Amino acid sequence: KRGKNKYFALNMLKSFTVSFFVLIIPLLLNLLMVHIVFAGGTYIPADVEMLKSEPNLFQSYSNPMFYNILYILVFSFIGGIVGSGATALAMAFPNRFILYPLAFILWYISTAIKPSIIGALTPFTVYPLSHYTFTIIFVVAINIVAVLFSFFKVTKYDQV
């Protein structure tokens, strides 16, 4: 028999792992197929001189594979964190009528702040990933707070 702490930690680990791999595997397969079909992705859909005026955009188009993989990893990591936050809330609030709005609010806050988390998940924009550092940290922080709140609620007050 496992204790409450171990049960909660294993569920968070499983949730993060499943969410992470559900996102990363199809994205990497898609990247591989696009790389094969389009012969390495050497086509640049814009004027090179225009790209030089936007250094961040030029840099991402100069190293497309690196930036694609970087954004896939960031997207999958954030998806894993959000999945863990939602799982933690599901453990703390078994009533679905409370759970669905709470999970939605967590994601809505992430998309409503400026700059939005959506921009951090979109490669090949004029903004570098560092432009979204605060947003990424904020999203991770609110989901960690959800996990910690749920941890204390589940382990201290609920029967598991």
Residue map of PLM features:
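Secretory targeting signals
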Residues: 12-91, 129-140
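Central hydrophobic cores of alpha-helical transmembrane segments
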Residues: 96-110
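Short, aromatic-rich membrane-interface segments at the entry and exit
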Residues: 97-100, 118-120, 134
